[in-house]
């Protein structure tokens, strides 16, 4: 994360906004401030790169369920509003790095129609060319959304 924040390349060379989500309280305050400044400086594109740190899909679902029960509500659209990711669209694609083929407690509810791409490369070492390859593959997929 430190290396990523130190790079200037992500500020201008990519056609997407960068947003960090999750519990950032474990990070040094200076780093959180840098993250917030980066997010403010990247609001020009419709495309988004959303980086979740210290996020648990299970915790998110449990917290949303507790809120629903407390408010005596049972509706899928309202349930989604109680999730921490409520203002984030469900991901169209997910790149899983490090050679793992599991979700690892990430976005358990939100990935029902997400296309997955896998690489053995660890995230800090994933190259722009690999990401572009996955994006090109993604655009070749006929998405059916459960139909």
Report residues per predicted region.
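Flexible, compositionally biased loop and terminal segments
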Residues: 1-147
């Amino acid at each position: 994360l430190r290396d990523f924040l130190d790079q200037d390349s992500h500020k201008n060379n990519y056609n997407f906004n960068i947003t960090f989500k999750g519990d950032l309280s474990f990070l040094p305050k200076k780093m959180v401030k840098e993250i917030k400044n980066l997010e403010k400086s990247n609001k020009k594109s419709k495309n988004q790169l959303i980086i979740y740190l210290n996020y648990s899909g299970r915790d998110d679902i449990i917290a949303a369920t507790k809120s629903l029960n407390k408010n005596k509500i049972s509706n899928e659209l309202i349930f989604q509003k109680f999730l921490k990711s409520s203002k984030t669209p469900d991901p169209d694609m997910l790149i899983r790095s490090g050679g793992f083929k599991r979700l690892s407690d990430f976005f358990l509810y939100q990935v029902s129609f997400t296309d997955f791409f896998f690489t053995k490369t660890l995230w800090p070492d994933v190259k722009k060319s690999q990401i572009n390859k996955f994006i090109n593959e993604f655009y070749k997929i006929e998405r059916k959304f459960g139909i």
